[in-house]
């Protein structure tokens, strides 16, 4: 079967890499892809806001399944566009995608269904927000309601921080803002828990801990993710049962009641305190870099997982992961997540010899006539799996050192909560 992958990041390269190993996949097309995907797939530049144009191309190339990597096409209704047509789309429909498209939508579902989460206040203007903040306890969390590429969350230590965050959001930093979410700050440790679902059944698809802050020791500004380790050190049977019964199942039931059809990945962002889970956020796709970290440990053919979700037969598919540990270290452009330069040459990447349990997934890269260049804030993902987290991290960092890209920056402490040195 010919398969199309929508997206340009490290997540999409990892998906492409896994599908390329499947004997059931005859051809892969990436929309638009990156320099890494171009090595194993055909990159195609289309207007991804024009679903009809995408449909015509898929019909022309006999693409039978689309895998949607990023959230924007899902929130914009790509699944609804292809409903009832000959092309399957792996991903949730427009109603289901509001779980990520609107944090306020998700909070209201939590409130109605007694899903454990932080206390919150919805504010509809800057003045209302500031008035509320004057009588609030700190620290607290301020969130932009819509999509913000993982960067619309502010942890505010005092009134002044919160005021600045609110002004940035209402002044349009993440697009037009009509509402803002002010949340209680939850003390604990974060964990990401993943499932796949076919709309009726769901199955576990890995756990991880992302490192969002740009600086070592989890300091500095939020990013899309500087690295990740998997599995999470926090996960145990008792906690997992609580996550399923108190959070995932009530949410999926609520989506079904609203007429949504959820087929795809669900990323459950959690705060864990005293072995109790609290929902921080949902993402309606795999995380990035969690996807790059988890997929190399998957023993099952990824194509079988994706197609069974599309066809409603997930209960017939056994999903098996190795017991290996995995770490991804992200190499970024200097200056990220603020100002950074693009089109910086990356030399000798193809000279790096990878061992069996090592991968380099491209993200912000571009293949040009003069060679490989950077094309984004997060540039390359260095992934290693083994039976020891420290070895994973050391191996990933050694790969970065071999590249010796002087325009890059990376964190050396990925997995610091699980690695004691």
Region spans (language model):
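Internal nucleotide-binding/catalytic subdomain
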Residues: 153-291
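Short, charged, surface-exposed secondary-structure boundary motifs
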Residues: 38-41, 98-104, 215-216
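Short acidic-hydrophobic, aromatic-tinged amphipathic segments that line or gate anion-handling sites
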Residues: 43-49, 121-125, 156
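Generic C-terminus detector
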Residues: 365-369, 373-421
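ATP-binding N-terminal substructure of ATP-dependent carboxylate-amine bond-forming enzymes
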Residues: 1-94
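Active-site "cap" helix and flanking loop/linker of ATP-utilizing ligase/carboxylase catalytic domains
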Residues: 244-266, 283-355, 366
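A conserved helix-loop-beta module that forms one wall/lid of the active-site cleft
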Residues: 90-151
């Amino acid at each position: 079967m010919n398969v199309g992958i929508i997206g340009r990041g490290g997540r999409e390269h990892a998906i492409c890499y896994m599908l390329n190993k499947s004997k059931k996949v005859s051809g892969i097309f990436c929309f638009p892809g990156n320099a890494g995907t171009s090595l194993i797939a055909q990159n195609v530049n289309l207007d991804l806001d024009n679903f009809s144009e995408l449909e015509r191309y898929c019909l022309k190339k006999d693409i039978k399944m689309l895998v949607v990597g990023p959230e924007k096409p899902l929130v914009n209704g790509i699944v609804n566009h292809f409903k009832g047509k000959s092309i399957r789309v792996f991903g949730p429909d427009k109603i289901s995608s509001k779980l990520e498209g609107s944090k306020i939508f998700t909070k209201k579902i939590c409130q109605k269904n007694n899903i454990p989460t932080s206390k919150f206040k919805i504010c509809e203007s800057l003045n209302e927000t500031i008035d509320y903040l004057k009588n609030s306890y700190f620290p607290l969390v301020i969130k932009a309601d819509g999509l913000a590429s993982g960067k619309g969350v502010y942890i505010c230590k005092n009134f002044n921080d919160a005021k600045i965050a609110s002004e940035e959001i209402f002044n349009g930093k993440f697009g037009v803002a009509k509402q803002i979410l002010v949340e209680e700050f939850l003390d604990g440790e974060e964990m990401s828990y993943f499932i796949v679902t076919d709309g009726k059944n769901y199955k576990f698809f890995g756990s991880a801990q992302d490192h969002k802050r740009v600086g070592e020791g989890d300091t500095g500004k939020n990013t899309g993710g500087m690295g990740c380790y998997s599995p999470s050190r926090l996960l145990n049977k008792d906690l997992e049962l609580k996550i399923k019964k108190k959070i995932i199942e009530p949410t999926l039931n609520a989506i079904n009641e609203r007429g949504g059809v959820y087929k795809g990945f669900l990323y459950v962002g959690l705060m864990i305190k005293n072995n109790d889970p609290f929902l921080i956020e949902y993402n309606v796709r795999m995380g990035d870099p969690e996807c790059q970290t988890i997929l190399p440990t998957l023993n099952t053919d990824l194509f079988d997982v994706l197609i069974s979700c599309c066809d409603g037969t997930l209960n017939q598919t056994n999903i098996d992961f190795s017991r290996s540990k995995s770490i991804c270290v992200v190499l970024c452009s200097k200056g990220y997540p603020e100002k950074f330069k693009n089109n910086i040459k990356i030399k000798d990447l193809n000279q790096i010899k990878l061992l069996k349990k090592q991968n380099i997934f491209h993200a912000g890269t571009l293949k040009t006539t003069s060679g490989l260049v950077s094309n984004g804030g997060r540039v390359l993902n260095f992934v290693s799996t083994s039976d020891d987290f420290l070895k994973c991290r050391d191996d990933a960092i050694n790969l970065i050192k071999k590249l010796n890209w002087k325009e890059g920056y990376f964190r050396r402490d990925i997995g610091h909560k699980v690695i004691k040195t």
